[in-house]
From Swiss-Prot:
GO biological process, one term: tRNA threonylcarbamoyladenosine modification
Binding positions for substrate per the UniProt entry: L134, I135, S136, G137, G138, D167, G180, N277
Record protein name field: tRNA N6-adenosine threonylcarbamoyltransferase
One cellular component (GO) term of this entry: extracellular region
Family designation: Belongs to the KAE1 / TsaD family.
Biological role: Required for the formation of a threonylcarbamoyl group on adenosine at position 37 (t(6)A37) in tRNAs that read codons beginning with adenine. Is involved in the transfer of the threonylcarbamoyl moiety of threonylcarbamoyl-AMP (TC-AMP) to the N6 group of A37, together with TsaE and TsaB. TsaD likely plays a direct catalytic role in this reaction.
Organism domain of life: Bacteria
Gene behind the chain: tsaD
Localization annotation: Cytoplasm; Secreted
Catalytic activity of the protein: L-threonylcarbamoyladenylate + adenosine(37) in tRNA = N(6)-L-threonylcarbamoyladenosine(37) in tRNA + AMP + H(+)
C-alpha cells in the first residue's frame, strides 16, 4: 500500500508518500515563513493562495522523487483540521479531486494525530502504550495513547499554547517572526536565576496548562527593566528569554511526570513544533532517565508541520479499515 499525504493546515505545504514495504519514499515541503514575516504573523488569505500555487507542483515532485505514477498510489490522506479554514479547504479539495480521478480512497486526518504518530517514523519508534505530549503554536496537550485511534485527553492548555506564548513573548522582546525560535536562541546566552518566573498551575492538581500569565509576567519584567532610552540591553533580553523558557520547560516537566504517574506508563512521546526545543529535549531526557523511562520524539524536520506525518497516519488508518473482520 502506498499513501500520498497532503498537509496544508497553516503556513507549510507538505506532500509525502509512504510505502508499506519501503517506508517514507518521498517528502516535499515548502514553507511560507519568509512571506508572512513582513506581516509579523500568518495571513490566512495569503496562506491559502500560496497553498493553491504549491500543492500540485509538490505532488508532481513527490511522485518524481519516489519514481511512481499516479496509478501506483492506493490512497490519499489530507489534513482535515484543525487549522486555517481556507488553507485546509485547499488541501482537502485537491486530495478529494485527485482521489476521485485516480479512483482511490481519500481520508481526512486530524492534524494533531499526525503529530502524535510522527515519532513512529523513526528507527527507534516507541511501542504502545505511551503518554504523548503534543506541543505546538496552537496546542499543548497530554494524551494517553493505547494504540492507533485509542486516545484519551488527559490535559490541555486552557488559554495560550506553549508555542503561542513563546511567539508572543518573543515579539515583546522585539524579535522578528517567528519569534519563538529566535527567543530560544537568545535564551542560550541568558544568565540563570537573574529573573524568577512563575510555574503556572503547578501548585494545584490536574494536568491542564496555562501560559498566558507567563506572557503578562514577561511584559511586566520587560517594562521594569527598560533603560533611560526605553530599551532593553541585549543581555537583559537574553536573561528574560532564559527565565521564560525555563519556566515553560519546568511547567511541562511537572505535568508530564504527573501524567506518567497517573497512567503508570514509562514511555513519553513528544511531538509538535516546540518539541524541537533543545532545552525541553535535554530536561525531559534527564527526567525520564531518573524515572527509568524512555522519551521519544521525531527528527527536527518532522517536528513542524509536514506531509510525512499525514501520509503515515493515513496509511495506518486505511490499513486498519481494510483489515478483515
Amino acid at each position: 500500500m502506498r499513501i500520498l499525504g497532503i498537509e496544508t493546515s497553516c503556513d507549510e505545504t507538505g506532500v509525502a508518500i509512504y510505502d508499506e514495504d519501503k517506508g517514507l519514499v518521498a517528502n516535499q515541503l515548502y514553507s511560507q515563513i519568509d512571506m508572512h514575516a513582513d506581516y509579523g504573523g500568518v495571513v490566512p488569505e495569503l496562506a491559502s493562495r500560496d497553498h493553491i500555487r504549491k500543492t500540485l507542483p509538490l505532488i508532481q515532485e513527490a511522485l518524481k522523487e519516489a519514481n511512481l505514477q499516479p496509478s501506483d498510489i492506493d490512497g490519499i490522506a489530507y489534513t482535515a483540521g484543525p487549522g486555517l479554514v481556507g488553507a485546509l479547504l485547499v488541501g482537502s479539495t485537491i486530495a478529494r479531486s485527485l482521489a476521485y480521478a485516480w479512483n482511490v480512497p481519500a481520508l481526512g486526518v486530524h492534524h494533531m494525530e499526525g503529530h502524535l504518530l510522527a515519532p513512529m517514523l523513526e528507527e527507534n519508534a516507541p511501542e504502545f502504550p505511551f503518554v504523548a505530549l503534543l506541543i505546538s503554536g496552537g496546542h499543548t496537550q497530554l494524551v494517553k495513547v493505547d494504540g492507533v485511534g485509542q486516545y484519551e485527553l488527559l490535559g490541555e492548555s486552557i488559554d495560550d499554547a506553549a508555542g503561542e506564548a513563546f511567539d508572543k513573548t518573543g515579539k515583546l522582546l522585539g524579535l522578528d517572526y517567528p519569534a519563538g525560535v529566535a527567543m530560544s536562541k537568545l535564551a542560550e546566552s541568558g544568565t540563570p536565576n537573574r529573573f524568577k518566573f512563575p510555574r503556572p498551575m503547578t501548585d494545584r492538581p490536574g494536568l491542564d496548562f496555562s501560559f498566558s500569565g507567563l506572557k503578562t509576567f514577561a511584559a511586566n519584567t520587560i517594562k521594569a527593566n527598560l533603560n533611560e532610552n526605553g530599551e532593553l540591553d541585549e543581555q537583559t533580553k537574553c536573561d528574560i528569554a532564559h527565565a521564560f523558557q525555563q519556566a515553560v520547560v519546568d511547567t511541562i516537566l511537572i505535568k508530564c511526570k504527573r501524567a506518567l504517574e497517573q497512567t503508570g506508563y514509562k514511555r513519553l512521546v513528544m511531538a509538535g513544533g516546540v518539541s524541537a526545543n533543545k532545552q525541553l529535549r535535554a530536561d525531559l531526557a534527564e527526567m525520564m532517565k531518573k524515572l527509568k523511562g524512555e522519551v521519544f520524539y521525531p527528527r527536527p524536520q518532522f517536528c513542524t508541520d509536514n506531509g510525512a506525518m499525514i501520509a503515515y497516519t493515513g496509511f495506518l488508518r486505511l490499513k486498519t479499515m481494510n483489515k478483515p473482520t
